[in-house]
Amino acid sequence: MNIAKQIAEELKIKVWQVEAVMELIDEGCTIPFIARYRKEKHGSLNDEQLRNLDERLTYLRNLEERKETVLASIEEQGKLTEELKQQILAAQTQVLLEDLYRPYRPKRRTRATIAKEKGLEGLANQILLQLLGHSVEEEAKQYLDEEKEVTTVEQAISGALDILAEAIADEADYRTAIRKTTMQKGSLVSTAKNAEEKTVYENYYDFSTVLSKVSGYQTLAINRGEKEKILTVKIEAPEDDILRYLRKKVIVKENEYTTPYLEEMIADSYKRLIAPAIEREIRNELTETAEDGAIRVFGKNLEQLLMQPPIAGKVVLGWDPAFRTGCKLAVVDETGKVLDTIVVFPTEPQNKVAETKRIVKAMIEKYNISLISVGNGTASRESELVIVDMLKELNRPVQYIITNEAGASVYSASKLATEEFPNFDVGQRSAVSIARRLQDPLAELVKIDPKSIGVGQYQHDMNQKKLSEALGNVVEDCVNNVGVDLNTASASLLEYVSGVSKAIAKNIVTYREENGRFKSRRELLKVAKLGPKAYEQCAGFLRITGGKNPLDATSVHPESYEVATKLLEMLGYQLEDIAGGLTGLSLMAKDTKKLAEQVGIGEITLKDIIRELEKPGRDPRDEMPKPILRSDVLEMKDLKEGMILKGTVRNVIDFGAFVDIGVHQDGLVHISKLTDKKFVKHPLDVVSVGDVVDVKVLQVDMQKKRIQLSMIL
């Protein structure tokens, strides 16, 4: 198999592009580095294309390794024909490869292997040849052997049919055809074990749909219902069609003696061996497809959450709401440094509202707080009412925002949080996290396991290794897309930088603590375990403001410093001029093709350098929608059908999007209500987490706490 050609066809890109990326990966380059600094080499493939390429490359290389193992095993058995070898080499999927290997794979003792041990293979061959001129019973008498425990004709025939049933089940072409027919004509069926029981799975109590039309969220919901022993699930295959197909393949000539036995054997082979295996394979395939889709959605949601714009330059009060144990508050300054913490008790059972207002007002005055970040967990609504009431009594403009606190409790109890705030309890740490999430969502959220951030669907039911890897890639892409301040970044943030491992991240922080601020990127080479390759991979993503070289504060890679300096000189600038940005530089450097030749660099790279010099250290998050800050409260009972509201998309799932409209119960915009202009294949084609949108209230169900919305575009 030509792996590069295969991937190029699948991803609809050029073979040379795939070969270039394969070479870079084999040299130890990371995807963020390849995406940003090797565009010339691979023709400007984007992050997503590169991730898909890397994933397929890993799969196909593993497949090639498995082929070598399979070929060696069959050759060792002396059963490898040229035809079989070519079939194995041509196999493009793991499933097809394993189908080809099935007849030769070492087996545990089966009914067929036991029958072979009893010497019944000859009888099986006679039946399969369909040439007998006398009864099968007569033929079977020759195979009776008391020593081998074949004492009756029935035993001999039964054993022979077992051998044939397994041979039929192991035939790769048959399995491929049956799998295809089942997928095309079969149905996924689920029923309730107890139809009277009220559960969230009632939609699946009497459910049936064609396999080819099962959606990802249906597969995952049914799987969970089965796991919780609420649903019984099966695949209903077109059995008559399949048995007809097998009969046509196996019974090549009608024989009054052998045909009845072959028909019996075919039915047994299908029902006992083929059908259960195909059902397992198809359900695994449905699950894998559903998981891949859910992971993709989770990744997109996570990306949007991490790329929320920072609210810079504000002193923030983080508010972690609670009832019995009190609300934990933490004040953090513009840089995220903790200035103060306190516990207040405005909620049940103590209801110290007046005292809470007095304390918080004093904190607002003392620290010049302009924003309150309230966690959306238990007692959030009660806290919000107290805050809104208090804000009306202030003589200064202070706003609040309800912040998704998912994962804050996980972080606050973690080893990392303990190291960061050894003298704080978990509530205080959580309040700090809730405040910092507004100031720099990316820097704070990287401290939390992405699976705990709360923007996924059925994440606990998925392949955890695959999920963690995919989400880790998303975080890595976001961190490198934004860039990291080398002198302020935590080890948690640094470890996602291209080329930086956990150990190197800790070593960078240690070096900083022992030697003070980094003054240049070159200084990174003094960090323990950070060698030339790691430096090449990470340097461009690590920024130094106020360092020796102004280029260290940009995304220009050190390997291009000479070119950047030469370019500036040609256009009449000096290095020092780039500090505030060189607006209009691209207009001065119109003929990029000619300029690229003059400075000795590729045109694509030159354009990137010019773009960066125009606005050094640009933050892509600045282009994202800003969060909605509030000063008044809206309650669910205030909602009326037809109301137009502004909200923030909190989560996107296969069947719609949940929108926060400020009433502590997210409303659902069903996929059919996202737009009236076109068919929507997936909600992510229309909205993303963090989008600020206008919605209309369609229906409010106070009893079930459900709000149905439609999008206004």
For every predicted segment, state its role.
Residues 14-15, 27-28, 94, 108, ...:
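Short flexible coil/turn linkers enriched for glycine and charged/polar residues
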Residues 73, 87, 97-100, 225-238, ...:
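Structured, non-catalytic alpha/beta "coupling" segments that mediate domain-domain communication
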Residues 180-188, 319-323, 378-379, 403-410, ...:
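A glycine-rich phosphate-binding loop feature that marks nucleotide/adenosyl-phosphate handling sites
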